[in-house]
Amino acid sequence: LFPFRQIAEEIKALNANVEKVAYSETISTNFSTIDTIPTFEIIWKNQVKPDIKTFENLRFQNWLRKKLKDESVIVIK
């Protein structure tokens, strides 16, 4: 696995408006294959505007893909 606590603390250090970070593995299928997708959920403080959340989630997704060396990582919320 990976050091979740350390990664969550780095996310908070990179953006103080992050309120909470969660991690799960999402299992999905297209009915011919099954995939397990590493999924991070970032909960933002209420004052963060939706367009900023979208931009920052994409930025964190790209960062996490590089950090974890896994292009299948997604960030939601």
Residue ranges of predicted features:
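Cytosolic C-terminal regulatory domains/tails of membrane transporters and channels
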Residues: 1-77
